[in-house]
Amino acid sequence: MAKEDVIEVEGTVVEPLPNTMFKVELDNGHKVLAHISGKMRMNFVRILPGDRVMVELSPYDLNRGRIIYRFK
């Protein structure tokens, strides 16, 4: 899948789940299941409930995503 095919949206982390998964509520009200991207995992970026994040969604499955950025 090419980088141009993804959908990037902003949201808020609602709750942490096991295995670095998070429930994220998007700005449009949808809730998605998201995991941390590899670069964030390598740099030990901490994500807590209430954090604003950028989530990358695949057009094929809009219920799962990847957290690619945590806003300061």
UniProtKB/Swiss-Prot annotation:
The keyword NADP does not apply. It is found in: Cytoplasm. Gene3D superfamilies: Nucleic acid-binding proteins. SUPFAM superfamilies: Nucleic acid-binding proteins (SSF50249). One of its GO terms (molecular function) is rRNA binding. Belongs to the IF-1 family. Component of the 30S ribosomal translation pre-initiation complex which assembles on the 30S ribosome in the order IF-2 and IF-3, IF-1 and N-formylmethionyl-tRNA(fMet); mRNA recruitment can occur at any time during PIC assembly. This is Translation initiation factor IF-1. It comes from Syntrophomonas wolfei subsp. wolfei (strain DSM 2245B / Goettingen).
